[in-house]
Curated annotation (Swiss-Prot):
PANTHER family: LARGE RIBOSOMAL SUBUNIT PROTEIN UL2M (PTHR13691:SF5), RIBOSOMAL PROTEIN L2 (PTHR13691). Keywords: Ribonucleoprotein, Ribosomal protein, RNA-binding, rRNA-binding. Residues 225-276 are annotated as: Disordered. The gene is rplB. This is Large ribosomal subunit protein uL2. One of its GO terms (molecular function) is transferase activity. One of the primary rRNA binding proteins. Required for association of the 30S and 50S subunits to form the 70S ribosome, for tRNA binding and peptide bond formation. It has been suggested to have peptidyltransferase activity; this is somewhat controversial. Makes several contacts with the 16S rRNA in the 70S ribosome. Pfam families: Ribosomal_L2, Ribosomal_L2_C. NCBIfam families: rplB_bact. It comes from the Bacteria. Belongs to the universal ribosomal protein uL2 family. GO terms for cellular component: large ribosomal subunit. The lineage of its organism: Bacteria, Pseudomonadati, Pseudomonadota, Betaproteobacteria, Burkholderiales.
Length: 276
């Protein structure tokens, strides 16, 4: 995997930086693990925009990724190939189990075709293996961590993502996330050893607006150039400052304003990410 700067043959390619991985499969994905994916364009079931700046983009299938990895314990598996996934920043790996079944999983750092994997409490502590947190040594770097036993991985799934197992006490373990937050998770929750691969993803440079549109992201218009009917910062003659602290189109303070309100899970947070 390497960062490649393109030749300045056009303004769009002048600053473009790509992540090139020659180990990725160049053919079509594994068809039985593909599903149709219909465009939502940031709308809900009423057609109302719930997420702005979404729409368009290239058509692609959804790759069914196994985030649970809990029903193949003790069955050896082999990495058949690594693949690009347009639905996420991390790459995925197609693994074939000894019983012949194939599944997609998130590819960990250093994973290569032909690598042997194992799920379950008896699995060795080796990158790519998945096992309950109660069987993972304290201090181990982990990824794809469950928040509830059997629900599937929810923490540290993006490219280059990881967490660190800090301690175990009773039925709960403490995990430090990349944000600095220390969180309690049940020891029966499962995690994968190692870091998520494709760690250079954050260093790429898109290069041109069109490439962002291919990804289904639409332009972001500043509130200060809108009309007063459209945004609290809008209006004025000529170029005019916002005249107030930055807010969203609905008047909520933005740029650092904390909006988290989930008392149900407050007890699971040992240290907030803001107190690093």
């Amino acid at each position: 995997m390497a960062l490649v700067k393109t030749k300045p043959t056009s303004p769009g390619r002048r600053s473009m930086v790509k992540v090139v991985n020659k180990d990725l499969h160049k053919g079509t994905p594994y068809a039985p693990l593909l599903e149709k994916q219909f465009q939502k364009s940031g709308r809900n079931n009423n057609g109302h925009i719930t997420t702005r700046h979404k729409g368009g983009g290239h058509k692609h299938h959804y790759r069914v990724v196994d985030f649970k990895r809990n029903d193949k314990d003790g069955i050896p598996a082999k990495v058949e190939r690594l693949e690009y996934d347009p639905n996420r920043s991390a790459n995925i790996a197609l693994v074939v189990f000894a019983d012949g079944e194939r599944r997609y999983i998130i590819a960990t750092k250093g994973m290569v075709a032909g690598q042997q994997l194992l799920n379950g409490s008896e699995a060795p502590i080796k990158a790519g293996n998945n096992l309950p947190i109660r069987n993972i040594p304290v201090g181990t770097t982990i990824n794809n961590v469950e928040m509830l036993p059997g629900k599937g991985a929810q923490i540290a799934r993006a490219a280059g993502g990881s967490a660190v197992l800090l301690a175990r006490e009773g039925l709960y373990a403490q995990v430090r996330l990349r944000s600095g937050e220390v969180r309690r998770v049940h020891i029966e929750c499962r995690a994968t050893v190692g870091e998520v691969g494709n760690e250079e993803h954050s260093l790429r440079v898109i290069g041109k607006a069109g490439a962002t549109r291919w990804r289904g992201i639409r332009p972001t218009v500043r509130g200060v150039v809108m009309n007063p009917v459209d945004h609290p910062h809008g209006g004025g003659e000529g170029k005019t400052a916002a005249g107030r602290d930055p807010v969203s189109p609905w008047g909520t303070p933005t740029k650092g304003y904390r909006t988290r309100s989930n008392k149900r899970t407050d007890s699971m947070i040992v240290q907030k990410r803001h107190k690093r």
